[in-house]
Amino acid sequence: QEQDPLGKLRGFLNEVMYKISTEPAHQQMFTIIFNLEPLEGEAEALRDHMRLQSINFFRDLEITLANAVRLGHLPKELDLRRAATLLHCTLDGYIVNWLHFPERIDLIKEADFLLDTLFGLLANPSPSLLRRP
C-alpha cells in the first residue's frame, strides 16, 4: 500500500503534463485521443488503446483516492467517483486547451498551480464532493 498516494499521483501528473508540453509524440497522441472525427488505421488503433488507458487511469484514480482516504489524507466522506471525475475532467480540459491554444497555458509552469488547486479541493471539499447518505 502506497504511503503517500497523493504525492505519487502528483508526481505522475506533473510528468504527464511535462511530457505533453515538451515531446511532440505525446502531443500527437493526445491530439488523436481528443479528436472526435472518425479515424482509420493506426490513428484509430492508437485512439482505441488510449481510451482504454483512460478508463484504467480513472479506475486507478479512484483506487489512489480511496487509499488516501484510508490513510487520513482526504476526508472519509469524499465521494470517490465524483472526486476522480473532477480530477480527470479538469486535467483533460487543461490538456485540450493547451493543444488548441498553447500560448494561453504553460503546462509546465501551471502544473503546480493546477495540482495545488485540485488537491486543495479534495482535502477541503465542498458539500457536493461528499457522499450523500
Where are these regions (language model features)?
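Helical cap/lid subdomains and adjacent loops of hydrolase enzymes that gate the active-site channel
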Residues: 1-2, 18, 31-34, 48-54
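Hydrophobic alpha-helical connector segments
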Residues: 1-28, 80, 84-87, 127-132
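Amphipathic alpha-helical packing segments from all-alpha helical-bundle domains
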Residues: 7-10, 22-24, 43-71, 81-85
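Hydrophobic core segments within long, regular secondary-structure runs in both alpha-
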Residues: 10-13, 55-58, 62, 108-119
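Helix-loop "lid/cap" segments that line or gate small-molecule binding pockets
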Residues: 14-22, 31-41, 117-122
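Amphipathic C-terminal alpha-helical segment
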Residues: 19-22, 67, 87-105, 119-130
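Hydrophobic alpha-helical segments that form the core
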Residues: 32, 78-97, 113-118
